[in-house]
């Protein structure tokens, strides 16, 4: 196929959009691939849609290769199935809700576990019908509070979601690993650099869960890995290396001290190192207690205290994952006034226990560890408060920040952190959704068998931005051949009639060889055409310029940055096609 730029619906921009922060956002708009409609909403113009469709094609091929069958559900979904799984409430403000003229509730689908489960339940009733693997590629909707970074975080996006249904856990694990391998093949074909990390399931539920993160400095997800062992996990899923408990016998008794105006960890440490305690004190020797209000879906607000070493901050993502699906907020001044036993800056475990406040601590707070913490009175702290002797928590919580240098959970070495963009997430859901809908089939022994389920998502439209992030330079985009909107960008950089005719004939020859050609036949200067060719990012650029009279054209490899000359003649199109094949 030949597409003439003189007829293509395209307008490139020379300057970055004022609100664009990341390279993919800037380049996709400047190159005319997408256009903004409203916050978190984008139109796909011809070039962008071609890239999107090529990614979809690769995804379909790999899903079909593992036995997937494509279906399509509506995006507008009724309330009832989501009530059955409690996700109508759990999703909170993150979904778009609406009513029809009769007052019936609907939402715009953020994901489709409920509908897939009900459909399979309605169609199949025997173990002989399984395993089943269904998928769809469809627009999804989430009411992002802060859409950003172009099409990386939006309110409408294209996603491939697939679901496996099996009669036993062995079948579920097989489907899970088949998807894991299929995703690896997809990302290899897309030339996306990624890492597979352990993850949390969140509102999706289930047990085993892994994310595929595309490494990128603009990524919103922080992950850690151990270079010695290959361990990798999203920070929300990192399990803190727990120290061994220590004996409490022989430890000094806890002593309350007047510490003056010391409501912060920094001021407390400064006091401790001037108080003649007989040792140097750091923030890691202190125990700070953070107070929250927590509310389960449909429930009331309750107090929750979290104790962690004073040298650690609470990681909001880890805290959110640990409390899922509850919502939470930090206590404000009005809350402290309502609970006078909570002395801001001087809170200790004793007042929490005496007043029935649930108290969870960091896994490093093990029995036998000694701490400096609040004494529940203004200007007073207790030194030498020993866990397991002087106070006991109600449990542990993974809410503290993870740092470079922390020991890996597998004990193989230190952790190092990096940033990534989530491009896929796979779950072994188990029976959460089939339990909700009593999705049973008749087993081989004639007894009912509850189906077990897997869920596997892949961000198709996000992949366009991810590839743009990983494959660009200072001149513009550099699409891998597998997803590029065209195979060859043929630039006519010579006004000579014979050169133009030769370029057109070359485009026809390439078309006959199955090469998709973008022919720049515009009445524009060579400089403008070259800038656009570099910006658009088609992997191969053929220049019919001044060398045409000498019997040569230029072949530029946009991906590798190399240029060579090819002789004109009957074999020119075949030579170009051979170069494309490598």
Swiss-Prot record:
Compartment(s): Cytoplasm
One Pfam short name: tRNA_edit
Keywords: Aminoacyl-tRNA synthetase, ATP-binding, Cytoplasm, Ligase, Nucleotide-binding, Protein biosynthesis
Catalytic activity as recorded in UniProt: tRNA(Pro) + L-proline + ATP = L-prolyl-tRNA(Pro) + AMP + diphosphate
One annotated GO molecular function: proline-tRNA ligase activity
GO aspect biological process, one term: prolyl-tRNA aminoacylation
Entries under PROSITE patterns matching the protein: AA_TRNA_LIGASE_II
GO cellular component, one term: cytosol
InterPro entries recorded: aa-tRNA-synt_IIb, aa-tRNA-synth_II, aa-tRNA-synth_II/BPL/LPL, Anticodon-bd, Anticodon-bd_dom_sf, Pro-tRNA-ligase_IIa, Pro-tRNA-synth_IIa_bac-type, Pro-tRNA-Synthase_IIa_type1
Chief location category: cytoplasm
EC number: 6.1.1.15
HAMAP family according to UniProt: Pro_tRNA_synth_type1
Role noted for this protein: Catalyzes the attachment of proline to tRNA(Pro) in a two-step reaction: proline is first activated by ATP to form Pro-AMP and then transferred to the acceptor end of tRNA(Pro). As ProRS can inadvertently accommodate and process non-cognate amino acids such as alanine and cysteine, to avoid such errors it has two additional distinct editing activities against alanine. One activity is designated as 'pretransfer' editing and involves the tRNA(Pro)-independent hydrolysis of activated Ala-AMP.
PANTHER family registered for this protein in UniProt: MITOCHONDRIAL RIBOSOME PROTEIN L39/PROLYL-TRNA LIGASE FAMILY MEMBER, PROLINE--TRNA LIGASE
Family note: Belongs to the class-II aminoacyl-tRNA synthetase family. ProS type 1 subfamily.
Domain remark text: Consists of three domains: the N-terminal catalytic domain, the editing domain and the C-terminal anticodon-binding domain.
Assembly description: Homodimer.
The protein's name: Proline--tRNA ligase
Organism, scientific name: Mycolicibacterium paratuberculosis (strain ATCC BAA-968 / K-10) (Mycobacterium paratuberculosis)
Classification of source organism: Bacteria, Bacillati, Actinomycetota, Actinomycetes, Mycobacteriales
Gene: proS
